[in-house]
UniProtKB/Swiss-Prot annotation:
It comes from Mycobacterium ulcerans (strain Agy99). This is ATP-dependent dethiobiotin synthetase BioD. Substrate binds at T41. GO terms for molecular function: ATP binding; dethiobiotin synthase activity; magnesium ion binding. It is found in: Cytoplasm. ATP binds at G12, V13, G14, K15, T16, V17, D49, E108, G109, A110, G111, G169, S170. The active site is at K37. One of its GO terms (cellular component) is cytosol. Its EC number is 6.3.3.3. It catalyses: (7R,8S)-7,8-diammoniononanoate + CO2 + ATP = (4R,5S)-dethiobiotin + ADP + phosphate + 3 H(+). It comes from the Bacteria. Keywords: ATP-binding, Biotin biosynthesis, Cytoplasm, Ligase, Magnesium, Metal-binding, Nucleotide-binding. Belongs to the dethiobiotin synthetase family.
Amino acid sequence: MTVLCVTGTCTGVGKTVVTAALASQANQAGIDVVVCKPVQTGTGNGDDDLAEIGRLSGVTELVGLARYPLPMAPVAAAEQAGQPLPSRDQLVQHIRGLDRPGRLTLVEGAGGLLVELADSGGTLRDLAVDLGAAMLVVVAAGLGTLNHTALTLEALAAQKVSCAGLVLGSWPAHPGLVESSNRDALARLAPMRAVLSAGAAQLSVADFAVMSAGAFDREWVATLVG
């Protein structure tokens, strides 16, 4: 299987735009790409991460499983909607059904690594374990990011989930000493795969494609497909 999970150190660090950029670059390189967002909350406010990924990346195979209207953690959003969360096995089988030789299957989580996505308490980390998938971690640039990133990497290592690297999801136009220092320190924790400028999601589709084409190392992207 060629499944790569995408998580963040917290909500709002840029998981969706990073997923879109990686999908766009792989798509432009001729790789067959499918993007899966197993659990999405906040759909009642018009939030649709899969639609945004499709708009930005040009990828047309976009797959979701469970959607809840309130912008809350999945467990709470499901409770408020009076709907169950899918089971861990349902999520795993759903994702496995998408994968095939030569295809890159990107799986974007909700919130951070240990947010519960399944009715049994299953998390994105659990799905990665079941799928044998590596985890790409989207990180912030500001204060607190070193601790948040280190905790996420420790949680991955505890279950022997491989970290595929880090991505700075929203690099400021005018970084200060804190951001620059953090960028160097983060690169010592795990390979820095890409640095996306703040506001990338507001680019035109054409400009986003140009940005994405060089966002990640091409050789690394090629290695993602088995």
